[in-house]
Amino acid sequence: MEKDEFFLKRIRELANLSWQRDIVTFSDFLNLNEQNIVSSLKHQFPQIVMETSGGYENAERQMVAFHPDALAFTWEYPIDCLRIEPKALKFSEELSHRDYLGALLNLGVDRSVIGDIVVQKKAAWFFCQNKMTEFFLENLCRVRHTNILITKVEDSDEFPRPVLESVSGTCASVRLDSLISLAFKTSRSSMVSYIEGRSEEHTSELQSHLNLV
């Protein structure tokens, strides 16, 4: 069975199970493409409400909850947030999103049990299915060559808020590389390597020359 066919089958199973048993069912963490596929199926299940959350506002990777329209009880997403920080700040490395994700996947888990990873300064926060929390707490002890401490975030106020800056200016042309170079105050050519094969519009891979209109 093709990957997309298996995914569609699983989503339909979750929706049907929710309706038949009058319960809430949850998907794994989904990427943007998978979320769009789920959204396209909503009309097939008018009796089911589909809601999403990634554990915090504006999360990219999100879990879908399926529940009957007239559900009479409250529920929560089975999502936990864990914080990673170096044991000894003095001897820690500069770690990237890729480093943290690699350390998690090297434990033998599937990407679908992990949500977003947010990196700020010397720490990182990541979201996971709560059934995996104890596993990560017990088994993740190093990221690259840095020994780390990992703890469960109990208070949402501990989660870092994004640092935003308003940028305005004039784009020479309506192109992705032009827009990003304006935002980061650098040349278009220097942005090409960050865009090609790494950016998506409605889940389709973009190249640097893409026109946005």
Question: Locations of the language-model features?
Answer:
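Single conserved hydrophobic/aromatic residue that forms the stacking wall/gate
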Residues: 201-213
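Ferredoxin-like alpha/beta domains used as RNA- or RNAP-binding modules
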Residues: 1-183
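Strongly charged, low-complexity linkers/loops
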Residues: 166-171, 190-194, 200
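A generic "binding-loop/recognition-motif" signal
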Residues: 132, 187, 209
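Internal, well-folded beta-alpha domain core
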Residues: 180, 187-189, 199
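A short glycine-leucine-enriched loop at secondary-structure breakpoints
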Residues: 184-185, 194
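A broad, structure-centric signal for solvent-exposed, well-ordered loop/edge residues
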Residues: 135, 157, 193, 210-213
